[in-house]
């Protein structure tokens, strides 16, 4: 092939390749159509079915993601719109109080209570809150409870070390 493929041969092959809607590779002196190299011996038979199959196969691929991608952004948009509307100043206080009972953190901007890193579902506060304090207690041991053991170097030593600072300077000291 490289021996046969001179400048005149390349032009002729490139023109044939363009008719088949293919790409001509000058270095390999080959015409590739739809990512597959076309056989020069059977240009009429091989080139016709090849562009048709990719056209059929390529149509459902872009359509399916377009169908699947449409409901995905819509669902969060439906869920996210009512949250800021519901969450007024009174609502935030009530949610923050509920969240404090669960030993969770209340995010005012999102109007959500997160306990042990997981957002609590507002729809099931009574059912969902009972097992959650149990699980967070296990999960949160590394955070608030283990800090009692593991925080000896961090908050407890400061508590011992802080006695001379705020506690040492008490009413007796004054």
Swiss-Prot record:
Q: Where is the composition biased (Basic and acidic residues)?
A: 49-100, 121-159
Location of the protein in the cell: Secreted
Note the effect listed for residue 86 to G: In clone PCT21
**Would you say which domain of life the source belongs to?**
Eukaryota
Q: Which GO terms describe its cellular component?
A: extracellular region
Question: What tissue specificity does the UniProt entry give?
Answer: Salivary gland.
| Documented effect of changing residue 40 to K | In clone PCT21
sequence repeats mapped onto the chain: 42-52, 53-63, 64-74, 75-85, 124-134, 135-145, 146-156, 157-167
| Residue numbers spanned by region Disordered | 28-174
Q: What is its main location?
A: secreted
Task: Cite the entry's keywords alphabetically.
Answer: Repeat, Secreted
**Region entry 4 X 11 AA tandem repeats: which residue ranges?**
42-85, 124-167
Task performed by this protein: Used by the larvae to construct a supramolecular structure, the larval tube.
Q: What is the name of this protein?
A: Balbiani ring protein 1
């Amino acid at each position: 092939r490289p021996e046969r493929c001179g400048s005149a041969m390349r032009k002729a092959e490139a023109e044939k390749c363009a008719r088949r809607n293919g790409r001509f590779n000058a270095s390999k002196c080959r015409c590739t159509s739809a990512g597959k190299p076309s056989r020069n011996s059977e240009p009429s038979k091989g080139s016709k079915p090849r562009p048709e199959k990719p056209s059929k196969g390529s149509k459902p691929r872009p359509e399916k993601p377009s169908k699947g991608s449409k409901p995905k952004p819509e669902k969060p948009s439906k869920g996210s719109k009512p949250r800021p509307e519901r969450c007024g100043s009174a609502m935030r206080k009530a949610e923050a109080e509920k969240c404090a009972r669960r030993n969770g953190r209340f995010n005012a901007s999102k109007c959500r209570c997160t306990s042990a890193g997981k957002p609590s579902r507002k729809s099931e506060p009574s059912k969902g809150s009972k097992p959650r304090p149990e699980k967070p207690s296990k999960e949160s041991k590394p955070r608030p409870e283990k800090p009692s053991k593991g925080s000896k170097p961090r908050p407890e030593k400061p508590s011992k070390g802080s006695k001379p600072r705020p506690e040492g300077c008490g009413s007796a000291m004054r």
